Each structure stands twice: as structure tokens, then as C-alpha cells.
């Protein structure tokens, strides 16, 4: 059955809606006070409604109720799929919509406000930590829809999975807090909630034309009405937006866009007005510090293992911890900045399933070794069983620039100090063995039919036999030894961080990683070897160390092939890894074959 199309003017709708909500006779002055519409406009609208049979004896009639039906809200969609990265570290433990603010769980308060307005058809779109929301179906009768693309797409993916449900629909975010109920059973037209911001702002600033229609939106501005909170789609908007979304959804450039960006790009075709709310009614929290400012008791009532770890480690109260912001979010780690007093720190939270990827006990053994040697001054403490770690934050630091000889020299000497420490680690790490492990993963997706793959593999295995025969020593090694894992402080001092892959390895392993991942030229690589040895390396040493460039390249090449088989796109790194394996292997094999096998070993000198 096709929904009816509304024929009321805005003033007529306002008058009838006021009478519907009151469910009692109202004078024109009472309607004026309820709708904030001028008395003259109210008078004209009342007379028109009386003439149409919508009002009798200052009450809404059955015909008036029927005239409001096209404006009845069908349903609501609450988007709760996102990672909420800016809300670190709390979002590491639970989704933002499940936080308790002023004594109420954010999404539960919003559902109850929708129910109070008579809206019971509610869909919650979930993704990250979706299991935290499942109970809402039993408790509140909501429908749960899973957005599996929440990692790879912005919130347009959440509207995509419910696009057929869009009609007269409220579209909400699970983490908003409304101090008064903004929801209504009947709404005249599509709108975006807005609050006024004085002075400069980085919020989305709205420009309007006649009737309050939104004509443009800019990111950032000053003294402006800004997008803030919930949105209402009427049927016309939903139909138009769904058509546009279906046209652009598969385009690669659409994936990272907010749905609002898609709307703005087609703003001429989609009618939506601005609805103004007084300051303080709509509350969006972009950081932990913001919600703490809104609810002073938030931290005291927060059940968080992360904050317990911080408080116990640093001997502070939970309310002493401030200035949170995310640093990075990846496959193995989630990291955020925080401060206690004037001191700054980093909290590392283990990613989901990383206990199957990373040997945390080996990592922490290496972290303690690096701290003892002064190679990593940032590490404070952590828990190898649970995977969390607290480190010092180095302000104004940057990553290593391997093109600067002085910095490359400092890095290679640091590696040499690690190797000469006389210490040992329980774990062993070998690039070729790791590559073979990745190869087994790759085979799980079908036969390896990459041209000349097995030819290259055979050469790598032969080179490994020759390099092993050199009998260079095993030593504690970082094994992820490249510029992004170095921090350079303002004085130029280095710290080597992220020891997840550390173990006992051939002393050439770290050199191999540096050449591959920093994409050093042959001349730069040879210079790095001179820095490492403190002299010009012998031909035997050079041959052996450059072999580990091949091994590192091949290992990560096979890893990249496996990731591509899984559906990930590693980009140009697949080629970079491949080239470092294939470009050197023939030359090195020839060097080994022509070298005298009885060439004496030359011990490196410091």
C-alpha cells in the first residue's frame, strides 16, 4: 500500500500536531505558546483547519488525525557500528554507546526516549563489539542488524544495510545524550538537528535558504549553526537518498565517506531543513575528557580494567588521568596518549586475537632487555598475559630518517650494541622459516600459480643453505628494525620501540629489515654496514648481510601474497618486497659459488 502524501502547510501541521499532543481543547494563544508561531499565523491555520473539518470545538477531529498520518514517524535507526577511535581507551573495552553517563547507558536512554514518543520500531546497526548490543533485542524489542563492513567503510555502510527500512525515519547515533526528549510521533519534513556555536569551530557549519532549507555545509567556520545530533528523513528524502546511495556505493571513493558527505554532494536534489536546538540539549562526546566535563562522576562510576591498570602502575587516581587521544589503531595494537599531571604516557591495548599472532611473553622479555640496555627508554611496565603496556610518551618526537647518515649510523650502532650485549632471549626468529609459515597460509587459498614463484623460492632456499654455512652468530634482534619503529627526540636521541617480533636471530636480520623497509640503495646499505661494523666489512660479511635483505624481502613478499589472498590490499609493498628478493638473489648466489669456502671469518670490531 502506497503511503499517503501530506497536503498540510507547515502552520496547519503545527496546529494539528499541538492539538494531537495535548489531546485536549486548546486556545489559539495556547497553540501559539506551544508552537512558537505568531498569533496571526496560528489564527489563519486554525480557520483553514476548521474549514477542512480537521478542528472542531478547539479539538482535533478524526479527519484531522487522518490528515496527520502522512507525517507519522515510521521507525528509527540507531547507528552503533563504529570503532569510536577518538574515545580511546574506553572504546577498547566496550562500544561507546554502552557507556553510562549521568547514571544511564547512552543507547538505552535514547531507546527509552524514542519509546516515550511512541516510536517502537527501532533498528540498531552494530559492528564493533556487536555482542554488547544483542541483549537490547530482548529488553527493548529492537531489531539488531549487523554491518560487517564497519572497519572498511564509514557510516554510509550502516545506512546501506538498512536502506530498505528508510521511510519517515529518525537516524540517530548510539552515543548522543539528549537532556530533553527531541523525538516526536509526527514530523513535518526532513531535518538535521543543529546547535549554534559562537566563535571559530571545526564542526560542520550549515548555510540555509528560504524556509530553512539547507543549501550548503562547510567543515569549519565561525558563529554558525552546526550539525549536531540526530537527523530525520521523510519519505521523499529517503527515496532520493537511497537511489543516490545505490548509484555510488560500489565506487572506491565512497567507502571512507560519511553519509552526510554523500548528502552534501547531492544537496540540490535532497530537501532537508535545519532544526535549531538550544545549547546543551544535544550532546556529542568526541573524547573522554568531554564526557567527564559533562558528567563529573563519570570516572568514579567507570568500570574499566584499563584505568585500574593505569592507576595502579602510576600510583594515581582515575580522575588524575586526562588528555586522551588515539595514536594508532592496527592489526596487533591499539594505542592512545594520556597524561597524569605534566607527565605524558602511551597505553597499548592488545588487538582482538593478537594472542594468536604475537608471543607476548617473548615480547615482554625483549622489552625488559631493551630497557636495561637503554635502547628503549619508553617502556615502563605491562602484563604479558593480558598484553597491555604503559610507556613514556616522547613529545615532539619523529621517526628515523634513514637518508640522514648520522641517524642511520646511530641506529646501526644501537643494533650492534644489542647484538654485543651478551644477553639471550628464549624465542628464536628466522625470516625463511617465517616465510615458509606464510606460504602454508597462502596454500590454504589454493595452489600457488604466481609466475616464477617456485624458481625464486628455490634460489632463496639455496642461498639460505650457503648463508647458514657461514656460521655467523645468533644474537638478540629486534626483527622489525625499520624507521617507523624508531623515535627521535628533539635532542636527536633514538629509542627503538615495538618489540613484538624480537628473538634470537642471525646478526644480519635487522640489517635485512632496514634495507627492505627503508628502501635503502646499495650504496646506503653498504654505508649502514660500515656503521654497524665500525669499519669496511669484509666480502664475506657483506655477502652474508646482504643475503638477509633477500630473506627479509622474500618473507614479507610471501606474507603480502597471503594477505592479498585473504582479500587485503597491501599496495605497493608487494612489489617492494618482491624486488628486494629478486634483485639481489642471483648476484649473491654467484658470489657464494665463486667464493673460497675456506675463507676465514673476520670478527667484527667495534
Predicted regions, residues:
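N-terminal nucleotide-binding beta1-loop-alpha1 segment
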Residues: 59-92
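Conserved beta-loop-beta/alpha segment of the NTase-like Rossmann-fold superfamily
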Residues: 131-205
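ATP-binding pocket architecture of kinase catalytic cores
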Residues: 325-432, 439, 446-455, 471
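Active-site acidic catalytic loop and adjacent metal/ATP-binding pocket
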Residues: 325-347, 462-511
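An alpha-helical support segment within catalytic cores of ATP-dependent transferases
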Residues: 305-323, 423-479, 491, 581, ...
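Active-site activation/catalytic loop segments of kinase-like enzymes and analogous catalytic loops
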Residues: 212, 508-537, 550-568, 587
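ATP/Mg2+ or Mg2+-diphosphate-binding catalytic cores
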Residues: 295, 299-303, 558-606
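Conserved core of the sugar-phosphate nucleotidyltransferase
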Residues: 14, 179-254
Amino acid at each position: 500500500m502506497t503511503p499517503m502524501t501530506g497536503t498540510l502547510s507547515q502552520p496547519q501541521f503545527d496546529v494539528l500536531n499541538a492539538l494531537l499532543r495535548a489531546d485536549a481543547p486548546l486556545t489559539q494563544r495556547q497553540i501559539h505558546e506551544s508552537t512558537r508561531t505568531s498569533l496571526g499565523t496560528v489564527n489563519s491555520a486554525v480557520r483553514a483547519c476548521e474549514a477542512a473539518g480537521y478542528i472542531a470545538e478547539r479539538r482535533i477531529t478524526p479527519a484531522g488525525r487522518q490528515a496527520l498520518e502522512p507525517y507519522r514517524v515510521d521507525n528509527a535507526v540507531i547507528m552503533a557500528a563504529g570503532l569510536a577511535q577518538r574515545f580511546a581507551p574506553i572504546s577498547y573495552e566496550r562500544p561507546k554507546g554502552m557507556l553510562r553517563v549521568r547514571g544511564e547507558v547512552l543507547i538505552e536512554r535514547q531507546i527509552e526516549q524514542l519509546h516515550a514518543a511512541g516510536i517502537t520500531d527501532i533498528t540498531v546497526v552494530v559492528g564493533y563489539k556487536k555482542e554488547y548490543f544483542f541483549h537490547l533485542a530482548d529488553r527493548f524489542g529492537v531489531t539488531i542488524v549487523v554491518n560487517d563492513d564497519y572497519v572498511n567503510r564509514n557510516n554510509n555502510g550502516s545506512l546501506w544495510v538498512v536502506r530498505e527500512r528508510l521511510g519517515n525515519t529518525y537516524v540517530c547515533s548510539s552515543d548522543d545524550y539528549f537532556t530533553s526528549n527531541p523525538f516526536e510521533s509526527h514530523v513535518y519534513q526532513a531535518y538535521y538537528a543543529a546547535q549554534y556555536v559562537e566563535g571559530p569551530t571545526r564542526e560542520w557549519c550549515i548555510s540555509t535558504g528560504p524556509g530553512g532549507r539547507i543549501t550548503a555545509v562547510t567543515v569549519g567556520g565561525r558563529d554558525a549553526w552546526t550539525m549536531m545530533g540526530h537527523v530525520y528523513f521523510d519519505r521523499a528524502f529517503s527515496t532520493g537518498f537511497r537511489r543516490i546511495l545505490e548509484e555510488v556505493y560500489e565506487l572506491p571513493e565512497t567507502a571512507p565517506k560519511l553519509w552526510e558527505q554523500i548528502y552534501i554532494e547531492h544537496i540540490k536534489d535532497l530537501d532537508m531543513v535545519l532544526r535549531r536546538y538550544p545549547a546543551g540539549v544535544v550532546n556529542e562526546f568526541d573524547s573522554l575528557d568531554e564526557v567527564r566535563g559533562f558528567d563529573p562522576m563519570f570516572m568514579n562510576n567507570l568500570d574499566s580494567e584499563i584505568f585500574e591498570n593505569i592507576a595502579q602502575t602510576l600510583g594515581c587516581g582515575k580522575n588524575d588521568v586526562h588528555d586522551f587521544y588515539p595514536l594508532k589503531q592496527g592489526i596487533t595494537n591499539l594505542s592512545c596518549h594520556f597524561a597524569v599531571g605534566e607527565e605524558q604516557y602511551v597505553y597499548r591495548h592488545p588487538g582482538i586475537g593478537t594472542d594468536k599472532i604475537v608471543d607476548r611473553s617473548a615480547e615482554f622479555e625483549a622489552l625488559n632487555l631493551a630497557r636495561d640496555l637503554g635502547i628503549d627508554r619508553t617502556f615502563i611496565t605491562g602484563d604479558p598475559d593480558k598484553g597491555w603496556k604503559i610507556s613514556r610518551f616522547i613529545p615532539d618526537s619523529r621517526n628515523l630518517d634513514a637518508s640522514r647518515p648520522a641517524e642511520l649510523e646511530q641506529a646501526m650502532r644501537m643494533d650492534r650494541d644489542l647484538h654485543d650485549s651478551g644477553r639471550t632471549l628464549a624465542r628464536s626468529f628466522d625470516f625463511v622459516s617465517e616465510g615458509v609459515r606464510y606460504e602454508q597460509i597462502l596454500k590454504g587459498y589454493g595452489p600457488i600459480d604466481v609466475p616464477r614463484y617456485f624458481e625464486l623460492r628455490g634460489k632463496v632456499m639455496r642461498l639460505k643453505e650457503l648463508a647458514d654455512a657461514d656460521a655467523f652468530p645468533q644474537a638478540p634482534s629486534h626483527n622489525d628494525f625499520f624507521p617507523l619503529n624508531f623515535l627521535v627526540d628533539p635532542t636527536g636521541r633514538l629509542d627503538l620501540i615495538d618489540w613484538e617480533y624480537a628473538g634470537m636471530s642471525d646478526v644480519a636480520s635487522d640489517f635485512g629489515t632496514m634495507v627492505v623497509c627503508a628502501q635503502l640503495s646499495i650504496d646506503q646499505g653498504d654505508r649502514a654496514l660500515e656503521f654497524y661494523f665500525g669499519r669496511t666489512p669484509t666480502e664475506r660479511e657483506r655477502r652474508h648481510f646482504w643475503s638477509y635483505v633477500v630473506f627479509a624481502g622474500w618473507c614479507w613478499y610471501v606474507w603480502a601474497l597471503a594477505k592479498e589472498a585473504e582479500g587485503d590490499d597491501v599496495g605497493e609493498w608487494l612489489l617492494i618486497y618482491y624486488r628486494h628478493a629478486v634483485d639481489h638473489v642471483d648476484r649473491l648466489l654467484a658470489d657464494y659459488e665463486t667464493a673460497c669456502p675456506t675463507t676465514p671469518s673476520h670478527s667484527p670490531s667495534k
